C-alpha cells in the first residue's frame, strides 16, 4: 500500500516508479481523489464545530425562554446535521475509492532493480556448482519416480484431479527429510524461530501481504470465506500486524514448513508434467521483520540462507536479480535461486527472496518505535523460500540419479533418512 502523502509530495517520482513496472501515471488521479476526500472531511469538521457551538446557544435560548431564537437555532442545527451526513457520506465514498486505487497498485521497484519486461531481462548475479556430466541420458523426475514405484500421478488425479501427486515409500520419506533438514538448518544455524501457523486465513491477512484484491483467482477459498494459504509468508508476516513493536525486539526471523495451495489460474498449459507446478505443494518459508535500515542487508542474508540449503544438497544453482517486469506485486527487490535440472538442460526457480519495504507493513499497520522516539514508523518485511520442498525433491532426484534409476542421497540428508544412502525400487 502506498502513502498518499508521499504521492502528494513526490508525484513525479511515484509515476516514474510505476513506469518502471510498465504502468501508466496514476498520481494525478490519486491526488484528485485525495483532495475531494479532504474537502469533504473539511466540510464535515466545519459543520461539526458549528453544530457544537449552536448546541450551547440552544441551551441558553431555552433557559432564557426566547422561543424564536430557540426555534431558529434548532432549525440551523437540523440543517448542519444534513450537511454532516452528506459530507460524511462523500468523505467515506472518496476514501473507499482512493483506497481501492491504492490497493491495486504494486510496490515501486528499488533503484537497484534492472529495467525489463519479463524473465528474459533478469540479470544473473552468480553461480554455484557445476552441472554433473552424466555418462548416460538423464531421466526426468517423473520417469525416475514412477520407475521406483513411489510417485503416483494417476491415482492422485483419480482422487483430486490434475496437478496433484502421491508420494510413497522412500520418496515420501525424502520429502519429509528435506523439510526437517531445512528447518533444522534455519533454526539452529540461521537464527530463525520455527512457527506452526494456520493454513487457513481471513481476507485481511491475504490483503496484508498483497494477494488480495488483485490475485483472488490464484487462490483457493473455503465455503466459510477463509483462504487456503498460497505460502506461509501470509500467516508468518501477519503475525506482526496491527502492532507497534519495540526496536529491541527486532529483527524478527521466522520459518515454517507448510502445505501451499494455488489454483495456477494463469499457468494453463505450463509445466503440466510432473511436480514443478502443483495445486498443493510443500515449502519451507522464511520471513524477516526488520527496521528500514536493516532491509537491504537482510535480503542478502536471507538469500544466503536459501543458498546454503542448495549447497548442502549439492545442487548447482544460479542467483538471478529479477527485473521490474518479473517481480511480484508486493516486492521491492527480488532474487530468484534457480536450480539445475538435467532433464530440461536448464535452471528452474526453486526459491524467491524479496524485500517488500514498508509496502506490506502499511497494509497490515505493522509498526515499530525507535528507542527514544515517540512516533512509531512502519516496519520493513521480507520473505523467501527456504526452499520449495517439492522442487528440491525433483532436483535431488534428477541431479543425484544413477544409471540404474536409483537415487544417491546427499550426505546432508542421510541423518534424516535413517542412514539410507540410496533410494532403490
Curated annotation (Swiss-Prot):
Its EC number is 6.1.1.11. L-serine binds at residues 231-233, 285, 385. One of its GO terms (biological process) is selenocysteine biosynthetic process. ATP binds at residues 262-264, 349-352. Keywords: Aminoacyl-tRNA synthetase, ATP-binding, Cytoplasm, Ligase, Nucleotide-binding, Protein biosynthesis. It catalyses: tRNA(Ser) + L-serine + ATP = L-seryl-tRNA(Ser) + AMP + diphosphate + H(+); tRNA(Sec) + L-serine + ATP = L-seryl-tRNA(Sec) + AMP + diphosphate + H(+). InterPro entries: aa-tRNA-synt_IIb, aa-tRNA-synth_II, aa-tRNA-synth_II/BPL/LPL, Ser-tRNA-ligase_type_1, Ser-tRNA-synth_1_N, SerRS_1_N_sf, SerRS_core, tRNA-bd_arm. One of its GO terms (molecular function) is ATP binding. SUPFAM superfamilies: Class II aaRS and biotin synthetases, tRNA-binding arm. It is an enzyme of class 6 (ligase). Pathway: Aminoacyl-tRNA biosynthesis; selenocysteinyl-tRNA(Sec) biosynthesis; L-seryl-tRNA(Sec) from L-serine and tRNA(Sec): step 1/1. It is found in: Cytoplasm. It holds the Pfam family tRNA-synt_2b. GO terms for cellular component: cytoplasm. Catalyzes the attachment of serine to tRNA(Ser). Is also able to aminoacylate tRNA(Sec) with serine, to form the misacylated tRNA L-seryl-tRNA(Sec), which will be further converted into selenocysteinyl-tRNA(Sec). Consists of two distinct domains, a catalytic core and a N-terminal extension that is involved in tRNA binding. Homodimer. The tRNA molecule binds across the dimer. Belongs to the class-II aminoacyl-tRNA synthetase family. Type-1 seryl-tRNA synthetase subfamily. This is Serine--tRNA ligase. It comes from Maricaulis maris (strain MCS10). The gene is serS.
